[in-house]
Amino acid sequence: VAEHSEVFNALIAAARNGKHVTVFVELKARFDEENNLATAELMRKAGIDIIFSIPGLKVHAKVALILRKNDKGERLRSYAYVSTGNFNEKTAKIYADIALYTCNKQIVDDMCTLFKVLRKEVTEPRFKRLLIARFNLLPELKALIQREIDLVKEGKPGRIILKMNALQDTAMIDELYRASEAGVQIDLIVRGICCLVPGESFSRNIRVTRIVDSFLEHARVWYFGNGGDPLVFIGSPDWMRRNLYRRIEAVTPILDGRLRRELTDMLELQLSANRKACWVDNQLRNIFKRKPGNDDVRA
């Protein structure tokens, strides 16, 4: 959270108004350790139940769970929140992020399970909708890529669009190379580190776009064509070893068709951008897209 956080103040106000509030505080937060400790102590004094980091495991997920109950303690409608960005007002002003706030029962139930994991109440969780790193994220990702490969083998188009901050994990890069060789059309929007080499014989169907503009592109959005019934996901992890193997990360599917179309339109707009965007070539150089005579597209 920010040093003077409205989120933090709202949580304290909720606790003082008789709400049961639990906050997981990740202490291993670059440059924010001291502030996180001080904030956690203030929340504890306000009656908030504080859960600190799990030793040897960083939690990078950006999630929240709201459970509404009646006077008898019976659960009413509940809500889950999954975001690509932190609860930080300072960075929220300059980072471009996406969040989902939903009452979908399966996602809410999965979120309850995730918080049980953070409380160390569950060690082998099962998730129906959420993709959680260290549990079901990697197998599901590989299955999604394989689905696109299978579609191409059936003579149908395979399509993948991935937006992230960094692409570094060699195992997942190899999965994308395998999909490219099978004929899946792949577009990547990668702001930072990109260890995938596009434009070679094994990656001829992969294009990499980089956008650097006024706001920092921080969202992680994944699109899979799925034979004309697209699957879209948002979440916290980049495709780096530390995110996929050594942290708790949370990814949610976007189940509402209108929201899926909105995110798909955003991805297509960013792929068409040429004013503040560039290609990444097979030497990993930035090649500006903007050319004289072309209409400017700023995404």
Annotate each PLM feature:
Residues 2-9, 170-173:
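Active-site core of PLP-dependent enzymes with the aminotransferase class I/II
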Residues 121-130, 155-157:
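Gly-rich Lys/Arg/Thr-decorated short loops/hinges at beta-loop-alpha junctions or inter-strand turns
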